[in-house]
Structures are given as structure tokens and as C-alpha cells.
């Protein structure tokens, strides 16, 4: 199967929301009754505030993954918190000192999700390559993400390092990970 990556267009956001709903609970599906609110919270700010920083992975003409991002988290967070109810954010589990370090030393951030049946086929790697090429062009020095259980293995293989970790509930570890743009 051939997987390719392209910048998202206005017509792709429904599919991005579908993939988010099927992968948003630490890589597993979000409960059907909660999907609309979940995708609204996690996707809408990127769709409305930074749509040009989103890519999709496509296989057999279907969206199988996406990466939403921003080059400047401090500016994005200020705008997002003015425009929307910020609600829960995984970064809020980390101390202010950790958040400030992430946002200033590693100013870009992103979310990446790939449907379970397509993991291991290179979609995540291709999405990251697209992001990092754009970050390089924009002269952004580094990026961060907060990942849940199990996904940190992929990001470690992609040369991300753990800056901090926290367990907000027993059995769940969130990791703040960073990687410079070389």
C-alpha cells in the first residue's frame, strides 16, 4: 500500500475529525457519545486558527492519519484561550516551569494520530518529515508534544527525548517530548 502526505485542505477536516475520534483515546477510539465534543475540543482550534499547519496521510484515497501543529505555542495558546473554552489540556498536568520551557525552548507543538490498521506503514514518519521541513523553512528551532501511553516508543525512534513525565491517574503516564529542527 502506498501512503503519501499532503497539506490538509478545507475539505479534509471531516476526515481529520473521524481519525481523531477513532484514535484520540491513547490511540484507541473515543466513546461514540463523546466523539463530537472530543473532536471539537482537540481539532477546532487548529482548523480555525492554524489550518495551514496541518497535514494528512492518505492511502487508497482515504485519510488514514493527520498531524496538526503550530509554530509558536505561546501565541497559539493565547489566541486559543481567548477564542475558546480551553477545557482540559494534557500540558496542564505539567508544572508551569515545564510548560514554559516547552513553549519557549521548543516553540512548535503538534498532535499526530494514525488509524490502528495503518500504523507501521510509514504514515507517522512521513507526517513528521512534512512538519519538520516546514519548521526548517520557518526557522523554528524545535518542537514538542505530549504523548500518552505507548506512543512514546515511536517518538523515541524518531529522535525525540523525554523532557518530563507525569502520571495524572494511576496507570497512565504522559510524556512531554522534544526534538530540535536540525
Language-model regions: role of each:
Residues 146-152, 158, 164-182:
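C-terminal "cap" of GNAT-fold acetyltransferases
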Residues 68-112:
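Conserved acyl-donor/pantetheine-binding loop and adjacent beta-alpha core of acyl/acetyltransferases
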